[in-house]
């Protein structure tokens, strides 16, 4: 009886040892352009959001902004996947109505302005498969220059006169996108 107990104990210990290796996980390092989110109202205690955007934050890392975001080409507006913007109520971009729901945000940078594009495409990697036919709304807004420089591409919502403003910033470039109710 002692012999069978010893064999059983060894068998259980061996099985446990093997299962430890089988359950070991290999997790990837932090992405070079980490994902972030911005919402309005931006108080985390406020559950009734109007809009939320999920995007990736590329870094300049000594590179010129013009290398990373060329003028005259549709840009994914960040890194990796194009940003997904969710409106929890009907809004407007310019005079175009945007129904509550999820969309993709693209931009078309030019020298003194940038065209904001809301597309019905979802789960889009980059801007490689962008189709103008799927645009829901477009608005050309001016680009301004700030005194301070942002290393990481950033987005934040603020309160506007008649709705919400999506502020985009990278390097010294600043853009204010008005969404109205």
Locate each region found by the language model.
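Bacterial Sec-dependent N-terminal signal peptides
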Residues: 1-27
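Weak global preference for isoleucine
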Residues: 6-12, 50-53, 85, 98, ...
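Alpha-helix boundary/interfacial micro-motifs
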Residues: 12-21, 106, 111-113, 118-119, ...
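Primarily secretory-pathway and cell-envelope proteins
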Residues: 23-76, 124-181
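Mid-length scaffold segments of soluble, non-membrane domains
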Residues: 75-124
């Amino acid at each position: 009886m002692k012999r069978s107990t010893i064999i059983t104990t060894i068998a259980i210990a061996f099985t446990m040892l093997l299962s430890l290796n089988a359950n070991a996980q290999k997790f990837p390092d932090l992405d070079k352009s980490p994902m972030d989110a911005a919402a309005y109202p931006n108080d985390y205690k406020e559950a009734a959001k109007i809009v939320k955007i999920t995007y990736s934050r590329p870094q300049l890392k000594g590179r010129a902004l013009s290398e990373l975001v060329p003028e005259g080409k549709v840009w994914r507006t960040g890194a990796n996947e194009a940003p997904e913007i969710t409106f929890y109520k009907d809004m407007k971009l310019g005079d175009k109505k945007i129904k509550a729901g999820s969309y993709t945000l693209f931009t078309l940078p030019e020298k003194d302005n940038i065209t904001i594009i809301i597309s019905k495409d979802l789960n889009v990697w980059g801007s490689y498969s962008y189709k103008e036919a799927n645009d829901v709304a477009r608005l050309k807004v001016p680009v301004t220059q700030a005194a301070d420089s942002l290393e990481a591409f950033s987005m934040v919502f603020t309160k506007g006169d008649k709705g919400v403003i999506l502020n985009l910033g990278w390097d010294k470039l600043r853009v204010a996108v008005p969404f109205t109710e």
